[in-house]
Amino acid sequence: MAKGKELKGRIRSTENTRKITRTMEMVATSKLKRATDRVAAARPYALALGEVLSHVYSPELADRFPLLRRPAAPRTVALVILTANRGLCGAFNANLIKEARSRIAELEAKGLTVELHVVGRKGVGFFRYVNRAIASQRTDITDKPSAADAASLIDGLMQRFAAGSIDAVYITYAKYLSALSAPPATEQVLPVAPPTAKAEGGVQHDFILAPSADAILEALLPLYVRNAVYRALVETEAGFQSAQRTAMKNATDNATELLQVLKRTYNSARQAQITQEIAEIVGGASALQG
């Protein structure tokens, strides 16, 4: 009955694992709802900022604002890479790192020096493992990213860009499209590229600019950049929760299938053992009668 005991042990272990993965799936589902609510709340604000900026901006103003500066001969760029602090999310982190490495290779092929600013333990751990220099790292951003997190992440880079010590800032993140799709993407954050469309859906709005276009643009540009980073943070978090929910659901389903196989195998082994014991008893009784 050694095989039967071994199977019972595997059944208990698999049942315990299924309880854990099912619980993690439920937690991820709950967190995903909150994360998608933050994504939905961030998008209208981003559209409104973009609409106002498109009305205020004009090419003749560009030379007066450092965040609009486009260096003629860029030398150094910063790449902000968003990853998760945790795993158990399928290929989510691996895909983000793959996207980042692809962009790094692309930028370096143009002769640019690329500074890495990595968010998340998984990204930090990977680039340390491959001995890639990291200019800054953050592992303290929680699963509820805030506007303050975005400001603390980008404000220093904005100051350096305005001072001319870096010539562009890019961000690699998970672009949340739906619960089933959050592909990795890289976007340029600095210099700011003002939206060209005057308004969404072809609707035009007239603005009265006060005190002046310059004053509005000076206040608006940092908000626009911070909001772009905040949106990347909340979309990446939503993508992570979606990936973890999917991974844990798959693990739960696999555990259920394995349990069915193990129980069938155990029942077959138990049945064979009982049949053998009956045969031995019958054989022994027949021998005594004989």
UniProtKB/Swiss-Prot annotation:
This is ATP synthase gamma chain. GO terms for biological process: proton motive force-driven plasma membrane ATP synthesis. F-type ATPases have 2 components, CF(1) - the catalytic core - and CF(0) - the membrane proton channel. CF(1) has five subunits: alpha(3), beta(3), gamma(1), delta(1), epsilon(1). CF(0) has three main subunits: a, b and c. It comes from Gemmatimonas aurantiaca (strain DSM 14586 / JCM 11422 / NBRC 100505 / T-27). Produces ATP from ADP in the presence of a proton gradient across the membrane. The gamma chain is believed to be important in regulating ATPase activity and the flow of protons through the CF(0) complex. CDD domains: F1-ATPase_gamma. One of its GO terms (cellular component) is plasma membrane. Keywords: ATP synthesis, Cell inner membrane, Cell membrane, CF(1), Hydrogen ion transport, Ion transport, Membrane, Transport. The keyword Transport applies. InterPro entries: ATP_synth_F1_ATPase_gsu (IPR035968), ATP_synth_F1_gsu (IPR000131), ATP_synth_F1_gsu_CS (IPR023632). It is a peripheral membrane protein. Signal peptide: none annotated. Belongs to the ATPase gamma chain family. GO terms for molecular function: ATP binding; proton-transporting ATP synthase activity, rotational mechanism. The gene is atpG. Its main location: membrane. It is found in: Cell inner membrane.
